[in-house]
């Protein structure tokens, strides 16, 4: 009964308004009030401040500064072997596995299409047909910067407006097409083992999604799909990111989805739904093909 009420509220609440309000408040320098909120949040969610570059609450002028706090050097060693992909974020794996007939598993009994996730781009979706996917959920207590699983050259970025449903196991099991409905930023990279998608999915009170090459992507929320393309590897202005390098961040929230082409990676066998992830640990083993182009 309680779960039914929570899901019903997801449809009734003014999610856009709540998100704007949360984003506004999280970016304000409110002195003692900001410190009170940060300390209460850290205690409630058991945030490990000893991993932070600056463990003192007083170092953070706004809640957003605290939320996207960098980690101290060496806190997340990145797997060194060239053929191994690294976890992109701290969190927990929601689902992972093979993309069957263009469908991704959201939760037991719920699938959604890769084409819908990729904003209806059927040509892009075809690149990941029968490939592999990994969905990583970032809890409030987690480190909220997102990193590269491997070296890659940025091919394109797509901003997709959408709903702002909360993302958690309850909504994943009860809101159809959750990740294909929510606001998201799709980043497509060319790698030595083929294309890779890294998708940052928004949620209720996720005030901002940012990338290191373009800054804040949302807000503003203009309600239209936006697309950016970038030079190929070796061309002037090409954007190349290395394994373990930061590529984006959430203020606040949410979820990272990775897509890989068929036969190009083998997901680490120890991973399953519910596995806790730490950025830099092994995600998969790559099967090299050709240099990115």
Curated annotation (Swiss-Prot):
It catalyses: a 1,2-diacyl-sn-glycero-3-phospho-L-serine + H(+) = a 1,2-diacyl-sn-glycero-3-phosphoethanolamine + CO2. It is a peripheral membrane protein. It is an enzyme of class 4 (lyase). Keywords: Cell membrane, Decarboxylase, Lipid biosynthesis, Lipid metabolism, Lyase, Membrane, Phospholipid biosynthesis, Phospholipid metabolism, Pyruvate, Zymogen. Is synthesized initially as an inactive proenzyme. Formation of the active enzyme involves a self-maturation process in which the active site pyruvoyl group is generated from an internal serine residue via an autocatalytic post-translational modification. Two non-identical subunits are generated from the proenzyme in this reaction, and the pyruvate is formed at the N-terminus of the alpha chain, which is derived from the carboxyl end of the proenzyme. Belongs to the phosphatidylserine decarboxylase family. PSD-B subfamily. Prokaryotic type I sub-subfamily. Its EC number is 4.1.1.65. The lineage of its organism: Bacteria, Pseudomonadati, Pseudomonadota, Gammaproteobacteria, Enterobacterales. It comes from the Bacteria. GO terms for molecular function: phosphatidylserine decarboxylase activity. Heterodimer of a large membrane-associated beta subunit and a small pyruvoyl-containing alpha subunit. The record marks 253-254 as: Cleavage (non-hydrolytic). Pathway: Phospholipid metabolism; phosphatidylethanolamine biosynthesis; phosphatidylethanolamine from CDP-diacylglycerol: step 2/2. Its cofactor is pyruvate. One of its GO terms (biological process) is phosphatidylethanolamine biosynthetic process. Binds 1 pyruvoyl group covalently per subunit. This is Phosphatidylserine decarboxylase proenzyme. GO terms for cellular component: plasma membrane. It is found in: Cell membrane. The modification Pyruvic acid (Ser) is found at residue 254. Catalyzes the formation of phosphatidylethanolamine (PtdEtn) from phosphatidylserine (PtdSer).
